[in-house]
Amino acid sequence: MKAVILCGGLGTRFSEETKFKPKPMIKIGKFPILFHIMKIYEKHGINEFILALGYKGNVVRNFFNKENLIKLNNSYYKYIGKKKEPLKWNIQFCFSGLKTMTGGRLLRLKKYLKKEENFLLTYGDGLANVDINKLIKFHIKQKKIGTVTAVIPSARFGAIKLNGYNVSKFSEKPQSGEGWINGGFFIFKNEIFDF
């Protein structure tokens, strides 16, 4: 099964970072967000990716074409740390437009997904603790065209419980209780393109 990662947004809220690179290329530690997302999928046996490029898409391509990445038969091997463990990913790059919205980006990938009964999709700027294999099993069992992950968001701030004028408890960013939000990881049947 292939995983589509949308990497084309402008990232206006991170303008100091995204002036020179797309949001998926903002680093967390030594590697960009995009790399961490791909590692989530890899952990669950997914190593075929379609990267839907847009704004500053050349930065994404260049990351995978650096000296420390070797291209062999459309697969990329990256040696990390002292173990030098190869990461074998098959990556297709697709330019999906500079200002194209999410649905339009997905539609432009139709020809790359025509042989896939189901495919995974996520945004290139969000990380989550998602069990991809459970998501796939749930999707197949439900027999629906699409499955979206839903999460209860954390509150923006930590909470303090007061007992009179004394602090009795600190709660660091508890769940907000404001309802479910889009967790950013999806799986679709190919039939999605019939709508």
Regions found by a protein language model. Give the residues of each.
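Conserved beta-loop-beta/alpha segment of the NTase-like Rossmann-fold superfamily
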Residues: 60-163
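Conserved nucleotide-sugar donor-binding
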Residues: 183-194
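Alpha-helix/helix-capping structural signal
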Residues: 9, 55, 133, 190-191
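A conserved hydrophobic position in a structured secondary element of the catalytic/binding core
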Residues: 55, 122, 162, 187-188
